[in-house]
């Protein structure tokens, strides 16, 4: 269950901005996983992959402020939330390009909680221009995750991606692909979610990635198969990954975005000559304390698209109306209803997410 607790406001530290939250967005799959894990005796509930090793081995020098590194919360409770928008109320002295009063969007499961006030490192914060609704900007983390997954396919203009899963990320992926001139085929066992997709460039909506679905993929790709597949579902079934092998063209790429069964059919994999890659969260820099906590950027000539630049691009696409959030069904509810909202989302296939509100906003809500 989700519990709201009173906590002291965070203390502003070097490299951080203090933000008064106006909207935060629920990521149903990730957050339910964390909530469920708190009920397991002895379990550590966190979003980080191998936190003890991952953060320590990124750089030999380590972070200059180790107290900022995320720690797995104890059993019983876990802070959740990682995508929000709000107004800056204070900045650390070393922050030069963000000022109090600026409107920003923030990411990070170690800091951008469902909370009235958060302290977020500069590299996990992006400016939001006038004209972009705060509740749309609050999806910045989900947008960056979808952008990074799309990049990992390596697809370019005119190619075709099979997207398995028509949830929030799948919906965003279809819109991003269209904005990039890439065609999509979407598979989901939930017909309601397939009907919610309204991006142009969707060649086919498939109720399953079964034999008929795989045949349909080949039919709309001149018999070759999809250039890439993004698996954006949570399931224990191995049929998803093995079906994706059958749906790919020779030499295609599969991007593992969700959590799914990994008992691979070697014959299918070998026959497809497929490349299987992961997509790590919001982009390069994620889980790197030097980047995220010490705010040391990756030079653009070394890494064109970091997690912060992916976040900023999502906000830009919102401002240019290339991404439409109005058509994505979500609940818009006060934070005080969090527990009931998590339960409602779990049983409602037509609602992809929830936006928590925190009183007054710049839209006058």
Spans of model-derived segments:
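Residue-level recognition of short, solvent-exposed, well-ordered loop/turn junctions
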Residues: 13, 27, 99-100, 121, ...
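Mid-domain Rossmann-like dinucleotide-binding core that forms the NAD(H)/NADP(H) cofactor-binding site
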Residues: 110, 133-211
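A structural motif shared across PLP-dependent enzymes of the aminotransferase-like
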Residues: 108-121
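C-terminal capping/lid region of NAD(P)-dependent oxidoreductase domains
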Residues: 223, 228, 255-258, 274, ...
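C-terminal substrate-binding/catalytic core of Rossmann-like NAD(P)-dependent dehydrogenases/reductases
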Residues: 264-328
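Glycine-rich beta-strand-centered segment in the early N-terminal region that forms part
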Residues: 10-25, 37-108
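Residue-level marker of beta-strand positions
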Residues: 23, 102-103, 117, 160, ...
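Glycine-rich cofactor phosphate-binding loops and adjacent beta1-alpha1 units
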Residues: 153-155, 195, 200, 204-279
């Amino acid at each position: 269950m989700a519990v709201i607790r009173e906590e002291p406001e965070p203390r502003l530290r070097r490299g951080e901005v203090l933000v008064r939250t106006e909207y935060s967005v629920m990521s149903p799959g990730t957050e339910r996983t964390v909530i469920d894990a708190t009920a397991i005796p002895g379990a550590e509930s966190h979003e980080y992959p191998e936190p003890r090793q991952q953060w320590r081995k990124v750089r030999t020098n380590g972070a200059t402020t180790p107290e900022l590194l995320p720690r797995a919360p104890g059993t019983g409770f876990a802070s959740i939330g990682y995508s929000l928008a709000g107004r800056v109320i204070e900045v650390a002295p070393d922050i030069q390009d963000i000022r109090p009063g600026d409107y920003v969007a923030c990411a990070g499961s170690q800091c951008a909680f469902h909370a009235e006030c958060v302290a977020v490192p500069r590299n996990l914060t992006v400016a939001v221009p006038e004209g972009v609704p705060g509740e749309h900007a609050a999806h910045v983390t989900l947008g960056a995750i979808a952008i990074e997954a799309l990049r990992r396919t390596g697809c370019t203009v005119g190619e075709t991606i099979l997207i398995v899963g028509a949830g929030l990320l799948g919906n965003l992926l279809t819109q991003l692909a269209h904005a990039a001139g890439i065609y999509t085929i979407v598979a989901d066992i939930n017909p309601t979610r397939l009907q919610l997709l309204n991006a142009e460039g969707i060649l086919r909506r498939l109720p399953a990635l079964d034999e008929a679905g795989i045949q349909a993929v080949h039919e709309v790709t001149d018999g070759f198969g999809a250039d890439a597949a993004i698996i954006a579902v949570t399931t224990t079934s191995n049929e998803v990954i093995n079906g994706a092998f059958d749906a790919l063209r020779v030499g295609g790429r599969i991007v593992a975005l969700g959590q799914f069964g990994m008992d691979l059919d070697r014959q299918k994999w070998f026959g497809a000559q497929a490349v299987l890659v992961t997509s790590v969260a919001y982009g390069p820099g994620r889980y790197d304390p030097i980047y995220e906590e010490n705010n040391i950027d990756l030079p653009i000539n070394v890494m064109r698209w970091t997690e912060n630049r992916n976040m900023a691009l999502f906000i830009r696409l919102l401002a240019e109306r290339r991404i439409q959030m109005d058509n994505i069904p979500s609940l818009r509810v006060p934070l005080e209803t969090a527990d009931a909202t998590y339960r409602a989302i779990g049983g409602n296939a037509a609602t992809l997410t929830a936006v928590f509100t925190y009183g007054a906003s710049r839209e006058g809500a």
